[in-house]
């Protein structure tokens, strides 16, 4: 215990070193902040009428205490360019309206939108958005941007999202994680990458989203059924990965990010450069790339064999924007080679029993960056072309085309190691037309149509067949706002045609009919259904609002759920599909009470209930499947009526000027109504508390800015809401509850005009050995032990 305490004290002392230098230094004034020129920050936004949402032309926006003033243009936009990081006081005024004020610290380009009230109305709160302008959704949503997002650098997308309430991840060892929203994941969660629906082999629990988190300036999660806007399958929610808009002011800037992680000796280098040429102001472009390498991960007591990975990612964007129209293009490539924990691939029934009983996995391993078999090689390309045309003062037509190509190669520990045992290739073409119609009184909305073509093929041993699908959709969403009320309604129709191709020998247990093994089968499925949403928000005052949403969504079974028959490489299981599966239909109800933008207390509580008819789930079969390659754990697809009920709570309280306390909790219960029992593999209860100490300026002339240190504790309960006779469904009981002590610290070092942002994160500081219920490899090994992450970000301006 003394050793653990010494480690913790040493970490806290290292993070607090700057505090001893100049605790009494005062923060900068706005005037001091803007005295440095060419710092490169752009502050912009729109000024509108709060009730009618019409733009206010000629509104004055002043940075109080500085000579900077901006007047809104014909679209209600204002701009400030080349600002330095610091605290600014914005004052917005317009004849006949009550002025608005906002004091805020800005460290990066932001969009701040103001909604002014006529003089007869009370002063309202200011809406702040760190990305594109958006309406407040009637569903619960969470955002991650700015410094909080930067603190997640080096983590996967799923790990970054765990900072939000209601989100967790399902893991397959230490290197693969998929996001979970309110107990649902994979095909029930849509990921929108730069406005394009991410399409890959997402049916696999070990198929993490092929997205580089460094491309995002904001991550947004819409919780609950969201099928109207984003299409069928969005039963659990939607994850929006949003890059920042292309630069709209003349100049060139760049950023270099460096990350090091201790538990797997991971190193990350990521860079971005963007420009808006002064000679061609309508043109903007951006280049971005990331290199990542990690070796075997270490638990408190041993290394996990063959758990290293490598990534090489690249993206490029360019846009041409005029007052009435604009076009832009985006291309990204994600490539990774990642090892699959060798202890999960066993050879016979005795190996399975021994693996479940032993405390340490076999084979024993040391640290290495080498990646052996089994491993996966994954490449994902995305090409997006987008154009818009303004159809009036507030209307806009969007046209989008996207092509995605995903190749997944899986190399086995058995057989020919020079070629993949299985190669998947899936190609997707997606088009969408969206019209945001002009304001009609207090009504604003959008209409759209989409079409998607998809083709999947494979080489090697059979697991999922060839298939071809056509999907089309029509949607209409309207929003009415007046005074304290915000009402939203939407309707969508989707149609899907699916045809698979396979030989009878690959599906004998599901066809129910005799025939020659080499007979080609082409089963066809047609699905069509409606999705709808109805929501409302009522503002009680500047800080308090209540939102309610009722929505329905649906999901057709995937090809893997219908026809899988083989070894699922990443999980080391033999999976059987079910050709008799029907369509899932979800009815989601959610209410959110939020108290926000208060100087001392802020909080939010969301309660939800999601009824899902014909819920498709995978259940382990305790009888392993024997193959010529060995014995494998077995899983089968089943269907039942289910109910998901839960609550998300988050709150923060400013104890003093510098010290804040925050807490959050997420609870979800998933019940099989058909069998009158709980469902398996559902997230357990999670509770997290933190104390955060901040100090704006330290050192001579504020050398250290935005200083903070945070200590937090995460408690995860044992999953006790499980079916009776659990060991008839799974190979081991849910693991014990656990507590993790974590810490973070950060500062921004000011070296003349050059800034260097430094962050230090410690996870599992007590080096606790534990296993997580949602890790598919919990049968074989512990989770990662103590891990220290050092992050350095260097912005550059030219």
Q: What does each model-found stretch correspond to?
A:
Residues 111-115, 157-160, 177-180, 192, ...:
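N-terminal periplasmic accessory domains that precede
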Residues 27-38, 46-51, 59-64, 93-97, ...:
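Short, acidic, small-residue-rich periplasmic hinge/interaction motif at the N-terminus
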Residues 258, 287, 397-412, 545-551, ...:
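Membrane-embedded beta-barrel scaffold of Gram-negative outer-membrane proteins
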């Amino acid at each position: 215990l003394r050793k653990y305490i010494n480690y913790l004290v040493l970490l806290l002392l290292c993070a607090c070193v700057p505090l001893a230098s100049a605790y009494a230094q005062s923060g900068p004034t706005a005037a001091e902040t803007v005295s440095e020129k060419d710092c490169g920050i752009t502050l912009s936004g729109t000024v509108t009428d709060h009730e009618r949402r019409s733009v206010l032309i000629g509104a004055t926006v002043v940075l109080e205490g500085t000579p900077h003033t901006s007047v809104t243009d014909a679209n209600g936009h204002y701009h400030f360019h080349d600002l330095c990081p610091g605290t600014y006081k914005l004052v917005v005024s317009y004849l006949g309206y009550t002025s608005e004020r906002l004091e805020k610290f800005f460290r990066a380009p932001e969009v701040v939108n103001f909604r002014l009230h006529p003089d007869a109305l009370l002063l309202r709160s200011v809406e702040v958005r760190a990305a594109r302008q958006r309406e407040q959704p009637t569903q619960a949503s969470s955002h991650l941007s700015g410094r909080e997002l930067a603190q997640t650098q080096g983590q996967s997308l799923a790990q970054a999202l765990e900072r939000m309430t209601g989100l967790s991840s399902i893991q397959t060892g230490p290197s693969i994680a998929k996001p979970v929203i309110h107990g649902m994941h994979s095909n029930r969660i849509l990921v929108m990458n730069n406005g394009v629906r991410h399409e890959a082999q997402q049916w696999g629990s070990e198929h993490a989203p092929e997205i580089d988190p460094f491309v995002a300036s904001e991550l947004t999660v819409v919780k609950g059924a969201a099928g109207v806007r984003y299409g069928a399958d969005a039963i659990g929610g939607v994850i929006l990965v949003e890059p920042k808009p292309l630069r709209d002011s003349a100049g060139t800037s760049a950023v270099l990010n460096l990350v090091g992680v201790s538990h797997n000796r991971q190193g990350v280098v990521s860079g971005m450069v963007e420009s808006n040429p002064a000679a061609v102001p309508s043109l903007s472009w951006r280049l971005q790339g990331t290199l990542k390498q990690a070796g075997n991960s270490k638990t408190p007591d041993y290394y996990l064999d063959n758990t290293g990975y490598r990534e090489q990612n690249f993206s490029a964007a360019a846009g041409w924007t005029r007052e009435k129209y604009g076009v832009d293009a985006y291309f990204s490539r994600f490539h990774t080679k990642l090892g699959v924990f060798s202890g999960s691939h066993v050879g016979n029934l005795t190996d399975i029993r021994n693996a479940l009983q032993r405390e340490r996995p076999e084979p024993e391993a040391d640290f290495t960056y080498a990646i052996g078999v089994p491993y996966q090689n994954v490449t994902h390309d995305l090409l997006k072309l987008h154009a818009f045309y303004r159809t009036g003062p507030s209307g806009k037509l969007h046209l989008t085309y996207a092509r995605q190509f995903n190749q997944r190669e899986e190399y086995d520990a058995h057989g020919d190691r020079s070629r993949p045992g299985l190669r998947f290739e899936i190609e997707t073409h997606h088009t969408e037309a969206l019209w945001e119609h002009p304001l009609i009184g207090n009504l604003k909305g959008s209409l759209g149509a989409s079409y998607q073509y998809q083709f999947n093929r494979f080489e090697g041993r059979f697991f999922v067949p060839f298939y071809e699908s056509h999907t089309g959709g029509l949607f209409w969403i309207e929003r009415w706002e007046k005074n304290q009320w915000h009402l939203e309604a939407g309707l969508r129709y989707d149609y899907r045609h699916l045809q698979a191709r396979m030989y009878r020998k690959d599906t004998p247990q599901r066809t129910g009919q005799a025939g020659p093994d080499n007979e080609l089968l082409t089963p066809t499925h047609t699905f069509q259904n409606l999705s709808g949403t109805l929501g409302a928000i009522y503002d009680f005052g500047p800080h308090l609002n209540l939102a309610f949403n009722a929505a329905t969504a649906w999901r057709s079974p995937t090809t893997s759920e219908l026809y899988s028959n083989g070894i699922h490489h990443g999980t080391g299981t033999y999976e059987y599909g079910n050709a008799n599966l029907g369509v899932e239909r979800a009815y989601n109800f959610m209410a959110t009470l939020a108290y926000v933008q208060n100087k001392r207390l802020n909080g939010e509580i969301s309660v939800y209930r999601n009824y899902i008819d014909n819920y498709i789930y995978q259940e382990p079969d305790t009888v392993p499947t024997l193959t010529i390659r060995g014995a494998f754990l077995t899983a089968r697809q089943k269907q039942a009526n289910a109910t998901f009920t839960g609550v998300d709570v988050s709150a923060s309280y400013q104890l003093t000027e510098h010290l804040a306390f925050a807490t959050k909790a997420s609870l979800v219960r998933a019940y099989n109504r058909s069998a009158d029992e709980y469902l398996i593999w559902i997230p357990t209860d999670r509770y997290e508390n933190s104390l955060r100490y901040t100090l704006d300026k330290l050192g001579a002339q504020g050398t250290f800015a935005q200083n903070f240190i945070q200590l937090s504790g995460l408690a995860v309960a044992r999953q006790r809401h499980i079916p009776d006779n659990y060991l008839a469904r799974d190979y081991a009981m849910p693991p014990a509850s656990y507590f993790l002590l974590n810490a973070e610290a950060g500062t921004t070092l000011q070296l003349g005009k050059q800034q260097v942002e430094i962050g230090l994160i410690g996870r599992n500081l007590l080096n606790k050995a534990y296993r997580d219920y949602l890790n598919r490899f919990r049968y074989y090994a512990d989770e990662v032990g103590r891990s220290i992450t050092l992050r350095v970000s260097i912005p550059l301006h030219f």
